[in-house]
């Protein structure tokens, strides 16, 4: 009884099977493994009256991670919609909305590409980086576009406005990003691997955001020329 009682309950007609695996294996894909186990059990258990349930810390952690992953996707989608509305209210231009969204979303896609290239998995720490990045990117984007619009009013020249904007606000954005990167890089001294990844990837996304706001954003403004109406009004 001492041996069988943890695994078999005759009164409730229940049985428990235990399986051990190395959860720290970097090649382990928990969600794929659990899905495969569920699929195999459905094929093996033909009796419709027989039910089964997977449990343990790995199942709990995987469910929590999948829930967080799905919530992050929905949150990012909602953030893009809200940002579109906010950009339109601030700048009253669909071109500006498109330009600002491209400049904000591109660094996030680039980050996920780097994570895939380096085989860095999504976990509780790394999955929140996108939300942090888009929050900081929006702030820099609004500052640059507003400064660009103010500089454009002087001579109605896109190239000169871009140069003055870089001289005026570019330095502040650059030094702010450097300070943030240095601050988050301290996390790389941690002994916890997810914390190390968080510090490393946050620094990378901050550099991506700075590059997008100082290189991609001005280029998009020069390409799409969103202030042509302002140019015509002043004439």
Predicted regions mapped to residue ranges:
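Membrane-embedded transmembrane helical bundles of large multi-pass transporters/channels
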Residues: 42-235
